[in-house]
């Protein structure tokens, strides 16, 4: 339920830009975006806010589940939203680090992604700042870099291969968009829990 609003908005964005697939001329593509830029931009901005709030709220939900407690999905999103700007900042810096590491080779990008993957629980559950959460994530995962690299690469490959297969099987349209949106979060939620479990394990040492 926590992911439902995010899946809906992301699906809506994909649906709004779906007609681009049928356009072959550059000027037609430019005209399409000129005509729909405001709507796509507004929905996309709302989707970004929801996505960041979801990621923050997800780790709060993990923590409460681990303690045998429950939280209303809207409350979890609300808690995530309160950390929107620092979470967005950390996510942006993390993305830049992964992007530049990909210039070396593709594989180092997965290593960096795995090493920085503990910043969400550090930020949401320990109230760490942007740079502190990234630094602590890197420091705490020093002995687990190889495992995190393997897990991050495996989750990415599973998602990529299944998504590619579904795109081949399903006709482009709202059905394909809906299935791919569900697939994304079927992978993201257990993927995030793996990182949360490592965070809890390191914290209890």
PLM regions with names:
Residues 1-205:
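Hydrophobic alpha-helical membrane segments
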